[in-house]
Amino acid sequence: RFVKKMGYDSFPELKYAYKKEEKEVSLYMVNDLDETIDCLKKFNTPYYQDLFKEVAYILGDANMIIFDGMGDSAKIAEYAARRFSGNGFFSAALTDPYQKVSMDGTDIVVVMLSISGDTVELIRKANAYKAAGSTLITITASDDNTLAKMSDYHISYYINDVRNELSSHTTQVPALSIIEILSNMTLHMCHDTLQ
């Protein structure tokens, strides 16, 4: 009866379908891991190292660093604020997508994290940050998006955006790695400057 309820005529047919699906899921996970590893390896190239140094210098020179994002990117923003605060930098996460931005943004650097870079609420906030005079750094999965085009500095990590109709399943490992690289570089640059 179970086999019939699952939509199959026989147990061997069910078993075959299960094994086929299991193989497809396994293949997807391997490809996804390969893509993530390839993405992380790019961060050691001269292009990325120079970009990271430039952005780390901007972050180290800021009076305040604000990290902003929505959904899964909000969690990365919260981690980033905690990481930079732990290194002695005045930083905060502002992850409410409807929070009004009203401040004097001079000497404030805003780091916006978004996979797509085209989320309406984040674009609205980015416009407000820019209007307030903040320096805008964006970290997204590509450079062909609205946030990337409106930012002062942009870091793309070029990974496929995996979504279904309900949510994103795109890995956040590259964004997390970028935050850790920037945090370490900023700390070392400021430490070296003080000596």
Stretches with model-predicted labels:
Residues 1-54:
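HTH-adjacent hinge/linker in prokaryotic transcriptional regulators
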